[in-house]
């Protein structure tokens, strides 16, 4: 489910189709990805198959399931709405709340308050996303206007694996680099034909940076196509894209008069 669904809850209960209610335990929760992993005591629960969000097609049919406006309590069944995938890879970056929404699935399936944390499934009934938020067009509007967003299931699987293992998501990292801004004085001294980017001062032995072939004197211009002009810019790219240890990044560098 979503982190914002269970945030600040004193007690969490899960009601299955048919009305059976169970108390849930929080295995782990992560505000950055807005995901939480819950556990029910028992066995032989019905469950949905998790699909893949790797090769989704715009125009593909999808179904959003959930509990909009607490309607589940009337019939003890989830509500369903049908639509298509309107867009993929929708990036919102880091919000003021601290959440980072990357590669979101946009759908015109009706998603309303109460749908958060519910599944977005494909025509085969496989879960391809976690319904998370809607765009209403104004602060006063409350209902769906056909623009909803879901966290891709592949991203959710990755977070859930960490939550199951440790109860949290580890975002500690080390680049193995010491850098400084390329100022006009540095560019003149080193004969660099510009005064932008950051220059590598030191590369830690055995680090991923060393393994990738980076060297002192290289000038990093972009990280994942985003300009970097001061040391903190590298950290900002990592945080804004929710990158973690083991993730790969693409750099544009200047070395010995050539761009690489």
Where are these regions (language model features)?
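Small-residue-enriched segments and motifs
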Residues: 12, 22-24, 83, 118, ...
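Conserved active-site neighborhood of the chymotrypsin/trypsin-like protease fold
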Residues: 1-72, 157, 222, 228-229, ...
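C-terminal recognition in membrane/secretory proteostasis and scaffolding
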Residues: 3, 25, 52, 57, ...
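Short peripheral tails and domain-boundary helices/loops at the edges of structured domains
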Residues: 84-98, 245-257
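Short, acidic, Ser/Thr-enriched surface-loop or helix-capping motifs
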Residues: 16, 21, 80, 122, ...
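Flexible glycine-/small-residue-rich
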Residues: 16-18, 28-30, 40-42, 66, ...
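Active-site loop architecture of trypsin-fold serine endopeptidases
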Residues: 9-10, 45, 65-82, 91-117, ...
